[in-house]
Amino acid sequence: MSKSNQKIASIEQLSNNEGIISALAFDQRGALKRMMAKHQTEEPTVAQIEQLKVLVAEELTQYASSILLDPEYGLPASDARNKDCGLLLAYEKTGYDVNAKGRLPDCLVEWSAKRLKEQGANAVKFLLYYDVDDAEEINIQKKAYIERIGSECVAEDIPFFLEVLTYDDNIPDNGSVEFAKVKPRKVNEAMKLFSEPRFNVDVLKVEVPVNMKYVEGFAEGEVVYTKEEAAQHFKDQDAATHLPYIYLSAGVSAELFQETLKFAHEAGAKFNGVLCGRATWSGAVQVYIEQGEDAAREWLRTTGFKNIDDLNKVLKDTATSWKQRK
């Protein structure tokens, strides 16, 4: 699918000079509150959340090609980011209704693609929970929803980054052996689907197609995939889309994420970058709450910097320019 000149220019603002998207993800809301709540008895305040996002933006965006933030708590951080760092803004409400079947998507009601663009976003990001094996009456609603957002982004001439998280209602633990067995097909089939032109997606933000904790050579316990099988799943993922795609870190450690990118590259996956969140900054949360702002800055300038610098070095050796795919 051909992109407009404006969309291409916007994606360039989100990429480094090599055409690789080395983006920092900090649009976490519910997950961040839960992380913070582990280290304090009272409910995290809006001011606390906003300030932590500002700290991360001030200290780390000089090393990232772009940052993903949410318009609920992240706007002060967007103002604090490095002038050369592009901006993605999240359009979805955080989490999903655990009492309703289907994990249906929902936009932030006060926002639109137009308003996110007016706020300075170079792209709109939307997170969708998707199970290719779910009932069609659930999935047709999700497809229609993504078509609406895609059309909105075309109208505003702003890139649409779709993040897809897979699940299976019959397997409550997506870190389990059972889910590891079905994950490759669920991830790759969802990518194939949302690459169709009708959705007007410009970049896919996706999970790696395997759980690396069950890959031979990485696994500490049970092995679900041999190295060859895992490599084939990465190859199949690359073949599933003509669109640029970037990997999310899914909360794994910085080390495991970097090793995963090396494995993907060796398998032949021509991925175009990352949107890496917790693997880079998660250790700052406890320091911020227990020791305060100055200590958190120090953590970000040392460990946080090392995490993002190591990641950038790995990306240089493993990722390919999105311009080769468009």
Curated annotation (Swiss-Prot):
GO biological process: 6-sulfoquinovose(1-) catabolic process; D-tagatose 6-phosphate catabolic process; lactose catabolic process via tagatose-6-phosphate
First-level EC class: lyase
Matches recorded under Pfam families: DeoC
Pathway connected to this protein: Carbohydrate metabolism; D-tagatose 6-phosphate degradation; D-glyceraldehyde 3-phosphate and glycerone phosphate from D-tagatose 6-phosphate: step 2/2
Keywords of this entry: Lactose metabolism, Lyase
Membrane-spanning parts: none
GO MF: 6-deoxy-6-sulfofructose-1-phosphate aldolase activity; tagatose-6-phosphate kinase activity; tagatose-bisphosphate aldolase activity
Organism superkingdom: Bacteria
Catalytic activity, EC: 4.1.2.40
Keyword Metal-binding: no
Keyword Lyase: yes
Classification via InterPro entries: Aldolase_TIM, DeoC/FbaB/LacD_aldolase, LacD_aldolase, Tag_1.6-dipho_adolase
Gene3D superfamilies: Aldolase class I (3.20.20.70)
Catalytic reaction list: D-tagatofuranose 1,6-bisphosphate = D-glyceraldehyde 3-phosphate + dihydroxyacetone phosphate
Family designation: Belongs to the aldolase LacD family.
NCBIfam families named among the record's database cross-references: lacD (TIGR01232), PRK04161.1 (NF003180), PRK12399.1 (NF009065), PRK12858.1 (NF009498)
PANTHER family (alphabetical): SULFOFRUCTOSEPHOSPHATE ALDOLASE
Protein name from the UniProt record: Tagatose 1,6-diphosphate aldolase
Source lineage: Bacteria, Bacillati, Bacillota, Bacilli, Bacillales
